[in-house]
């Protein structure tokens, strides 16, 4: 692989060519209106038609059909709601549970204002944000794991 020489922009011949537009890609067809008005809608409508066609002709069953007369013992939410579900399940007062749920995004919104004087992007030079992140991740993991266990074992995660 050879070394490419950078163009000398002080060369009058090169400057004259650049002034005429010779240094740019001047062949081919323009993107407007050809691509944007004719090719893009064909691709977008073709993608939508393929998706709708597959959904109509080959519907996939999502699990087994629901039985309205057989209710499971404990209804669990989706996995990403496990920490919030665990908060609501373990706190006896409903108002306190809702306040704890509201405190999570409120606490996350206050983190940038705690370290607004620190302009570093390195997490090791931002101790408050790093500590909040690590503690929040550990608490969310413990709450999420606890939500999958029965209520008797959920607070101790079955370890004690």
Swiss-Prot record:
The lineage of its organism: Eukaryota, Viridiplantae, Streptophyta, Embryophyta, Tracheophyta. It is found in: Plastid, Chloroplast thylakoid membrane. The keyword Electron transport applies. Belongs to the cytochrome b family. PetD subfamily. The 4 large subunits of the cytochrome b6-f complex are cytochrome b6, subunit IV (17 kDa polypeptide, petD), cytochrome f and the Rieske protein, while the 4 small subunits are petG, petL, petM and petN. The complex functions as a dimer. GO terms for cellular component: chloroplast thylakoid membrane. Component of the cytochrome b6-f complex, which mediates electron transfer between photosystem II (PSII) and photosystem I (PSI), cyclic electron flow around PSI, and state transitions. This is Cytochrome b6-f complex subunit 4. It holds the Pfam family Cytochrom_B_C. The keyword Glycoprotein does not apply. Keywords: Chloroplast, Electron transport, Membrane, Photosynthesis, Plastid, Thylakoid, Transmembrane, Transmembrane helix, Transport. It comes from Citrus sinensis (Sweet orange). It is a multi-pass membrane protein. GO terms for biological process: photosynthetic electron transport chain. GO terms for molecular function: electron transporter, transferring electrons within cytochrome b6/f complex of photosystem II activity; electron transporter, transferring electrons within the cyclic electron transport pathway of photosynthesis activity; oxidoreductase activity. InterPro entries: Cyt_b/b6_C, Cyt_b/b6_C_sf, Cyt_b6/f_cplx_suIV, Cytochrome_b_C_euk/bac. The chain crosses the membrane at residues 36-56, 95-115, 131-151. Disulfide bonds: none annotated.
